Amino acid sequence: MSKIIDITGREILDSRGNPTVEADVVLEGGVRGRAAVPSGASTGTREAVELRDEDSSRYGGQGVLKAVGHINGDIRQRLVGQEAEAQESIDQAMLDLDGTSSKRRLGANAILAVSLAVARAAALAAEKPLYRYLSADERFQMPVPMMNIINGGAHADNNVDLQEFMIVPVGAGSIAEAVRYGAEVFHALKKVLRGRGLGTGVGDEGGFAPDLSSNVAAIEAILEAITQAGFEPGRDISLALDTASSEFYQDGRYVLASEGKTLDKEEFTGVLASWVEQYPILSVEDGMAEDDWEGWALLTQRLGQRVQLVGDDLFVTNTAILKEGINRGIANSILIKVNQIGTLTETLAAIRMAHEAGYTAVISHRSGETEDTTIADLAVATQSGQIKTGSLSRTDRVAKYNQLLRIEAELGDKAHYPGRQAFTHP
C-alpha cells in the first residue's frame, strides 16, 4: 500500500484555450500521478457542476482558481495520509467533503482531477500501466472508435444542425488498422470537400466544419470519401451520428434550422428512421432531447432493435438516471464521460450497471480536451468495446489514438478488436 503524501492542483488550458484543472498526487517513494479534466460544449442539464470562478477580469469568467484552491486546501488536507489503492474510499471522502448531490461546492472538475490522479499514482506504484491496474481480470478488448470527421452543432461555427458525423471502422482487424482506415478517410474527405469548393477548417473535435446544404449532405460527402479511400461503406466502415438533439429542441419541437424544418417527435423519429434505412448507420446518440422521454420511448420502439441508441445528455453517466432509463426501456446504450459524474468510482459503477442490463457503454472524450489519455486506458480496462475521441486531427484527439496503439502493441495477441460485434445490433 502507498500513502498519499502530497496533492497539488493547478490551472491549465484545454484544447479550446479555456482554463481547466490538473492535479498531481504524490505517494511515498516519490511516485507522482497526474490527471487533467476535460470540459464540454453541449452539456446535459443534470451533469455534475464544473466550478468556474465567474471573475470577468480573468479568462472571461472561465477561470478555475476556486476549484484549484479546493484541491490545494480541503481536499489535500482530507486525503494526505490515505492509501492510494483505496480508490472507492478516497472518492467517497471527497463526496462527503463536498456534501452536495451535484458536487457544486468543491466542483466536479476539482474532485475528478484528484480522483483520476490517485488512480494513476496507484498504478505507477504497482508498476502497472493504468489499463491493467483498472482491469478486473486479464481479458483486454480494444475499443472500436467512432471518429467524428464532420463537426456541426455546438462543436463548430457552421450551419450544420447535427453535432457529429462519425465513421466506424467495423471491418478493421485491429486498432492499428482502424486508425489507418480513419486517417485515410479523413484525408479523402478533405479532398472531397475541397473539390466541392467547401471549407476544410476543423471544429473542436478535429473534424471538418464546412457549411453544407443539409445534414444529409454531410453523410453523403463522408460516403464518397469512404469509397474514394478504397473502402466499402457498411462492410469496412459504417456510420454513427450524434444528433445532440437537446441543442435544437425548442418548445417541444425539433428545429432543423439549416433545412428550414420544425418537426414534432414523431416526425423527427421518422427522419432518423429514414436515414437508418437509407445509409449504413449503426449508432445514433442523443436522438431525442434529454427531457423528451416520450420521444425517447418512441425512438427506442422504432429503432431500438435495429441500431445502437446512445444516451449522453439523457443519462449523463449517472447511475440513478440510467437505472430509470433501463426500467423504462429507454435507449440501449450509455455514453460514458468521466466529468459528467466526477469520480472514477462512479464512472466504473455506471459502466457496470450498463453492462449488467445488456446496454453497451461508449467511453467518450469532451469537446474541450487535454493531452490526458485516461479514457483510452479506461476503454480497454472495462472492455467497453467502443470509444469516441474525435477525428484524426488535433493532438488532443490523436493523443488518445496513439495511446490505444501503444496498448495494443504491448498486449500483442491478447488484444482483441471486436469490430461490428461491439455494437448492440451489428
UniProtKB/Swiss-Prot annotation:
SMART domains: Enolase_C (SM01192), Enolase_N (SM01193). CDD domains: enolase. Its EC number is 4.2.1.11. Its main location: cytoplasm. It comes from the Bacteria. Its cofactor is Mg(2+). Keywords: Cytoplasm, Glycolysis, Lyase, Magnesium, Metal-binding, Secreted. (2R)-2-phosphoglycerate binds at Q163, K337, R366, S367, K388. It catalyses: (2R)-2-phosphoglycerate = phosphoenolpyruvate + H2O. It is found in: Cytoplasm; Secreted; Cell surface. GO terms for cellular component: cell surface; extracellular region; phosphopyruvate hydratase complex. Mg(2+) binds at D242, E285, D312. Pathway: Carbohydrate degradation; glycolysis; pyruvate from D-glyceraldehyde 3-phosphate: step 4/5. The active site is at E205, K337. GO terms for molecular function: magnesium ion binding; phosphopyruvate hydratase activity. Binds a second Mg(2+) ion via substrate during catalysis. One of its GO terms (biological process) is glycolytic process. It is an enzyme of class 4 (lyase). It holds the Pfam family Enolase_C. Component of the RNA degradosome, a multiprotein complex involved in RNA processing and mRNA degradation. Belongs to the enolase family. Catalyzes the reversible conversion of 2-phosphoglycerate (2-PG) into phosphoenolpyruvate (PEP). It is essential for the degradation of carbohydrates via glycolysis. This is Enolase.
